[in-house]
Structure formats: structure tokens, C-alpha cells
Design a protein with these regions (language model features):
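Glycine-rich, small/acidic residue-mixed loop/short-helix segments
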Residues: 58-148
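Contiguous alpha-helical scaffold segments within structured protein domains
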Residues: 1-73, 145-148
Length: 148
């Protein structure tokens, strides 16, 4: 949250950062969520400038970002493809809305490669993190199988 606020601060005339997260309950997982809200400067930056300042967020790239992204590149044995990239729409004026593809699928022909991640920190238990990632993939799998 701190790195997100730090990245947004130069673009905002007002920024509200809650001191504590809330619990976001989804069908099969719980998340800690912090809703950061800001008001952009009147001449506000283009959407893609904001996306560039925010991507990758600490949630997917770690912090400090340059060091963490470098370490992930050295240790992670997979190509993330579009995982954790910005997704959304941008119009001809540069306005739009973007989110982060934290859970996504890349579908080619009859095959789908599913992506989900976990927040790895010093005290993380690898088995618990794998179980969490598996739980996060269930809605994508179910949607692809027509369960919903």
C-alpha cells in the first residue's frame, strides 16, 4: 500500500490511504484489501502514464521494485506472459479504466494456462502458498468448464 501511495502521490491533489485493510470475501477466498482513493491534478496525466508509474505493483513485483523484479527474473522458472499485467480499456482521448490481471488465463486452441499468485514474505509457508494459489484458480477453472 505504501509503494502504491508513493507512486500516486505526485499525480494527485488529494490522496486517501486507509490505515488498516478491510476483508474482502469472495466465493472461495478471503483477501485483505485497502481502497486507496485519489483526486488527480486538474491537468491530470494520461492513463498510460499512471499505469507506467504503478506497474508492476508491489503485490506482484515486490519491493523495492527494481531489486525485487530482478530477483524474480533470476529465480522464477516461468514466463509470466500477460499475468499481472494491466487489463482494461483506453479510448482515443487517453481516458479509460485499468485493472491488474492477478487471476487470468491464456487460452490457445483447446488449452488454457491459468495464472494466480500469492504474497510471498519472509514467514510464508510454501505448502500454504501453493494451496492458496490453487484455491484462487478454482473460479477460472469453473468458468472455463461451464460450472457457473
Amino acid at each position: 500500500v505504501d509503494s502504491l501511495a508513493q507512486a500516486l502521490r505526485p499525480f494527485c491533489v488529494d490522496l486517501v490511504v486507509p490505515t488498516a485493510p478491510s476483508v474482502l470475501q469472495l466465493r472461495n477466498v478471503l483477501h485483505l484489501a485497502t481502497e486507496v482513493r485519489g483526486v488527480l491534478h486538474p491537468a491530470g496525466p494520461p492513463l498510460l502514464t499512471l499505469a507506467d508509474a504503478l506497474h508492476p505493483t508491489a503485490a506482484v513485483g515486490g519491493t523495492p521494485t527494481p531489486d525485487a523484479v530482478s530477483t524474480i527474473g533470476e529465480l522464477e522458472a516461468m514466463d509470466r506472459g500477460r499475468y499481472a499485467g494491466p487489463v482494461g480499456w483506453v479510448d482515443a482521448a487517453g481516458d479509460g479504466e485499468l485493472g491488474i490481471a492477478l487471476r487470468c488465463a491464456q487460452v490457445v486452441d483447446r488449452f488454457a494456462r491459468l495464472f494466480a499468485g500469492c504474497g510471498i514474505v519472509a514467514g510464508s509457508d510454501p505448502d500454504s502458498e501453493v494451496a492458496e494459489a490453487a484455491a484462487k484458480l478454482v473460479p477460472i477453472r469453473d468458468a472455463l468448464e461451464g460450472v457457473y
